[in-house]
């Protein structure tokens, strides 16, 4: 599984590095888009950045499985929402090995795939969550979850709080 991209507050995430074992190479994950930018393509795609200011719009998640190989390397990142100014602006979740970003809800990273290499019930290569924090309900102010399989949680709103790193040795993407 290729590595996830590094994140920095307020900037576009870097795409991850390729991972090679013998003759098998897995493409690194695409970096997530920052505010008003699309996510990058990669083994698993990065999520689309949220919009801000007076420029509403939807920004695309990066394509997964890039370059296209068999078996599939990962899924696409989710798109950001296009809410008008003053309402919640949410970035897209990163793609995971098993499902695309946003499959389980806006900002949510896609789930990774189960594998029995280290025993049953082990999941790898979850996508990182999109930036922002929950604004309503009992979890108001809490970060969004990364996908099952080590995906990192989101940072806070406003672009000033970095997301969480993916879990070590799982191939999970950072939030």
What are these regions (language model features)?
Residues 1-175:
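Low-complexity, glycine/proline-biased repetitive segments and flexible coils/loops
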């Amino acid at each position: 599984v290729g590595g996830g991209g590094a994140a920095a507050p307020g900037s576009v995430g870097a795409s991850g590095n390729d991972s090679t074992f013998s003759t098998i190479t897995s493409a690194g994950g695409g970096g997530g888009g920052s505010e008003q930018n699309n996510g990058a393509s990669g083994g698993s795609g990065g999520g689309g950045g949220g919009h801000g200011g007076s420029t509403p719009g939807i920004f695309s998640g990066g394509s997964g499985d890039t370059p296209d190989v068999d078996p599939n390397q990962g899924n696409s990142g989710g798109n950001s929402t296009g809410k008008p100014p003053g309402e919640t602006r949410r970035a897209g979740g990163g793609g995971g090995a098993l499902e695309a970003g946003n499959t389980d809800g806006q900002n949510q990273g896609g789930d990774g795939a189960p594998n029995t290499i280290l025993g049953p019930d082990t999941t790898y290569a979850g996508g990182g969550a999109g930036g922002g924090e929950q604004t309503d309900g009992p979890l108001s102010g809490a970060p969004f979850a990364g996908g099952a399989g080590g995906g990192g949680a989101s940072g806070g709103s406003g672009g000033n709080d970095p997301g969480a790193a993916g879990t070590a040795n799982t191939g999970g993407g950072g939030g």
